[in-house]
Structures are given as C-alpha cells and as structure tokens.
Amino acid sequence: MRRTRLTRHAIAVTGVLVGALALLLGPTATAQAADECTTRTTTKAFATFGDTNDYFPIGGGTFESGSLSNFVVTGGASVTGENEPWRVLGSWHTRSAALPPGATLQATFCVQIGEDSMRLFAKSPSNAGGSLTIKTTVATAYGSAMTSSTVGSKSSAWTPTPAIPLVNVSGPDGKQYVTLLVTNNGSGTWLVDDILVDPWKTR
C-alpha cells in the first residue's frame, strides 16, 4: 500500500499588536472558547506514529455529534460517515468533516500556556495535486500571531499532519484564543478528522 506523503511548507510566524480580545473574536466566540479552557481529557492519540505526547480534542473536533455547530463553514463543508481508520479516540467513532473544493472550516478555541501545538488527520482526494491549507491565528489582549501550513498528497489515504505550532502570546490569565482555518485548495474533496491540541510542552 502506498503511504501518503504530507508536506508542510513555509510556516510563517508574524506578530502584530491588536486591540482588545473582545473586538477580535466577538462576545459569543469569546464565551464559547473560554468554556473550552476548563476541561482537558487527554490521550496519546498519535502514539502509533511515534508521537507519545498527550492530546485533547477541540470542541466539536471529533465530528461525532454529526454537527458542525462549533465551526463556521463555507463552500458546502459537512459531516460525512467516514472516520480516520486508526480510531485513535475510540473504536465507536464513525465520522469526519468533508471539504469540497474551495470549502473552509473555521473554529475558535481557548488554549493555555504550554499548549503550543496541534495535529489532525486528513485524507486527500483520489486526484493528485490537491492541497489543504491550515492557518492558525492566536490572539490575546496583548497581540496576535499567525502560522500557515500547506499539506499536499500524491495518493488517497488518511494520514496525520505534522505538528502545527501555536505561537505563545498568552494574556495575563495565561490563556489565548486560537482561530483555526482549514481551506481546501484542490479540485477534489478532502476529509478532516480529530483536531487535537498538545496540552503540555513534552517534547
């Protein structure tokens, strides 16, 4: 079986001063994200791939509810009945998110000091040459920073992404808010599953 080759290009990190966090995210997004900073149920989700760090899912990031209510979506993104094959969060998991060409999936969630990277699973379409862009914008009242990763594949198979850094610009409470934007830049449908954050700097 051919193994999917993922590439990550040009992780750019930039910093710029911004206004208050409420102006960046809006009151609803801020309140929802703050709730997610209170509970951490972790698992060694990527141990099969040599990564023994602990991870926890972002709100709605397993897609098992069948809803994308935790996300802002465009371009017909939806929940589909296919899971990443390792079922790292439970054998009963059966769903993922499908992103048709041009579709986007966006979520805002809270992280704390030391929660400095994330990973997810992606499945490329059968036609070669497509790509998935994963952008993170980290924001606090002190400032913001962005990372951008491009994932490409030459075969159709599920695979974990490399670690995606979350830049530390945490506020006085030790928290910061991440907006994740996943964009399908290809001509076929990508699947995305199990969006997970590494809660401690264990590397």
Regions found by a protein language model. Name each.
Residues A34-E36, A47-G50, F56-R95:
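Extracellular glycan-recognition surfaces and repeat-rich motifs
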Residues S187-R203:
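Exposed low-complexity, polar/acidic, P/S/T/G-rich flexible segments that act as propeptides
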